[in-house]
Amino acid sequence: MANIKSAKKRAIQSEKARKHNASRRSMMRTFIKKVYAAIEAGDKAAAQKAFNEMQPIVDRQAAKGLIHKNKAARHKANLTAQINKLA
């Protein structure tokens, strides 16, 4: 454990940020899973609706640095391609 006051404070802040980031990451993954579930079900309308809900969430997390911008772009591109493949 840290002995210096500033190091103790950083440890507390770091733990708080870790919990906050974990919550945001979990939320983002849930939205992505909803899109995959709709694609698996073969429901294009539901998949498109879920994608439209997921897109701003993923973009926001990328802008805040929670995930890399390329990862956000990759998720969106892959899901868009799969949705377009549905008849």
Swiss-Prot record:
Organism: Escherichia coli (strain K12)
An annotated GO cellular component: cytoplasm
Function recorded in the entry: Binds directly to 16S ribosomal RNA.
Gene name per UniProt: rpsT
Coiled coil: none
SUPFAM superfamilies: Ribosomal protein S20
Gene3D superfamilies: Ribosomal protein S20
Family: Belongs to the bacterial ribosomal protein bS20 family.
Region (Disordered): 1-26
Name of a matching Pfam family: Ribosomal_S20p
GO MF entry, a single one: structural constituent of ribosome
The entry's keywords: Ribonucleoprotein, Ribosomal protein, RNA-binding, rRNA-binding
Any Gene Ontology biological process: ribosomal small subunit assembly
Quaternary structure and interacting proteins, as annotated: Part of the 30S ribosomal subunit.
Name this polypeptide is given: Small ribosomal subunit protein bS20
Keyword RNA-binding: yes
InterPro entries recorded: Ribosomal_bS20, Ribosomal_bS20_sf
